[in-house]
Amino acid sequence: MSKQPSLSYKDAGVDIDAGEALVERIKSVAKRTKRPEVMGGLGGFGALCEIPAGYKQPVLVSGTDGVGTKLRLALNLNKHDTIGIDLVAMCVNDLVVCGAEPLFFLDYYATGKLNVDTAAQVVTGIGAGCELAGCSLVGGETAEMPGMYEGEDYDLAGFCVGVVEKAEIIDGSKVAAGDALLALPSSGPHSNGYSLIRKIIEVAGADIENIQLDGKPLTELLMAPTRIYVKPLLKLIKETGAVKAMAHITGGGLLDNIPRVLPQGAQAVVDVASWQRPAVFDWLQQQGNVAENEMHRVLNCGVGMVICVAQEHVEAALKVLRDAGEQPWVIGQIASAAEGAAQVELKNLKAH
């Protein structure tokens, strides 16, 4: 008989009971997000979903994303209740720009040691995000991987699938000189630029938990969840049929994201003076001595979504968006690009 102690999975750092406890805690979260097309609940090997009724030639649209190093800030601040909203937003906002309605969402949560309370907070946020987007949380993977992550640190990834009518895909091909560009405000930096943000905080030696901007704690401004634009944009598409292109302003800011939906020969002329930049961006620029162009290449600077419509549809589009609770404004227009010109021109950049 061997005198060696009998080892278990728990001895190796994996607690199966904790994983099962988490599944029980999040079943109600998934249930709240359920769409009629989803067949079955959590716990199966795969999630089943029908194509919604009414589509003649449905095209599935997929996307995956994370929340970048905003997660590090969440871990440092021990604030886990809204990072799941960020995760959903990063995926569904990317889907809606081509006109797709998000159908279902899955998440991947990897950690060194599973803290059930933390994970439940994260997944509850994911559920809240799915409700805001109108999609179902149909499953996910929780991986406890000792030796891969430090303690209870965790990483997140999200995966989303949506559907759009083939004839109604929005791809930017109809964008023409003279079209107007509308903008929807962001809630803050959303989920991009946090490596720069964290570097600024470090170099400035800023105590972000004791700094207030416009009467709000800086931590609240930095951790504000990414806005989910799905329902207002689907309403705009359905009620006006006027949307030619949309750009989700993520990493790369206005300068890198608008060109992704422009046809060759088109240039977006954006008036930076058309909106009041939120104070959090001015604070970051001052503390980090960040060049103005760099600000617009890394951060959204207060703009979460840009929408292209023909000039004659501007007023109708603004009205639909306002009726949906948004605060849109005209941010610029499309021009013909001169030979060798950048696809985005920022007008009225302030001197730094």
Swiss-Prot record:
Q: Which UniProt keywords apply?
A: ATP-binding, Cytoplasm, Ligase, Nucleotide-binding, Purine biosynthesis
Name a biological process GO annotation: 'de novo' IMP biosynthetic process
InterPro entries found in the cross-reference section: PurM-like_C_dom, PurM-like_C_sf, PurM-like_N, PurM-like_N_sf, PurM_cligase
UniProt xrefs under NCBIfam families: purM
Q: Which reaction does it catalyse?
A: 2-formamido-N(1)-(5-O-phospho-beta-D-ribosyl)acetamidine + ATP = 5-amino-1-(5-phospho-beta-D-ribosyl)imidazole + ADP + phosphate + H(+)
HAMAP family recorded for this chain?
Answer: AIRS (MF_00741)
What family does the entry list? Answer: Belongs to the AIR synthase family.
An example GO CC term for this entry is: cytosol
Give the pathway: Purine metabolism; IMP biosynthesis via de novo pathway; 5-amino-1-(5-phospho-D-ribosyl)imidazole from N(2)-formyl-N(1)-(5-phospho-D-ribosyl)glycinamide: step 2/2
Task: Write down the EC number.
Answer: 6.3.3.1
* Domain of life according to the entry: Bacteria
GO MF entry, a single one: phosphoribosylformylglycinamidine cyclo-ligase activity
The name under which this protein is listed is Phosphoribosylformylglycinamidine cyclo-ligase
Gene that codes for this? purM
**Where in or outside the cell?**
Cytoplasm
Q: Which Pfam families match?
A: AIRS, AIRS_C
